[in-house]
Amino acid sequence: MRHQLRVPKLGRPADQRKAILRGLTTQLIREGRVTTTKAKAKALRNEAERMITLAKEGTLAARRRAIGYIYDKKLVHQLFEKAQDRYGDREGGYTRIVRTVPRRGDNAEMAIIELV
């Protein structure tokens, strides 16, 4: 039973939802910003902040957990090198969500999620 579990379902089965969030997280870390729907941006925020927190931790175990989640291994190493300098003084709040115009085809609420 799912009593009071607040996981955004995104209208997909669990395996597809996990794959989408992994891909979006990888893209966000690589590019610095991603344009997607508002619901996906809110779900992506949790995953991206978790990866940045792991990178700030900097341990071997944290690096291995990040490699298991992010698709690009080189990107993980870059993230771990830069995270402490970039986010060392922050305790969370590594991303920003900005709402944009609705998507033309289906009028879905769109948003830009970017790294601060």
Swiss-Prot record:
Q: Which InterPro entries match?
A: Ribosomal_bL17 (IPR000456), Ribosomal_bL17_sf (IPR036373)
Q: GO terms for CC?
A: cytosolic large ribosomal subunit
- Extract the Pfam families matched here: Ribosomal_L17
BP terms from Gene Ontology: translation
Which domain of life, per UniProt? Answer: Bacteria
List the SUPFAM superfamilies: Prokaryotic ribosomal protein L17
**Any one Gene Ontology molecular-function term assigned to this protein's record:** structural constituent of ribosome
List the keywords (alphabetical): Ribonucleoprotein, Ribosomal protein
Q: What's this protein's family per the entry? A: Belongs to the bacterial ribosomal protein bL17 family.
Subunit structure, interactors included? Part of the 50S ribosomal subunit. Contacts protein L32.
**Which PANTHER family does the record cross-reference, listed alphabetically?**
LARGE RIBOSOMAL SUBUNIT PROTEIN BL17M, RIBOSOMAL PROTEIN L17
The entry's protein name is Large ribosomal subunit protein bL17
Say which species the protein is native to: Prochlorococcus marinus (strain MIT 9211)
Give the gene name: rplQ
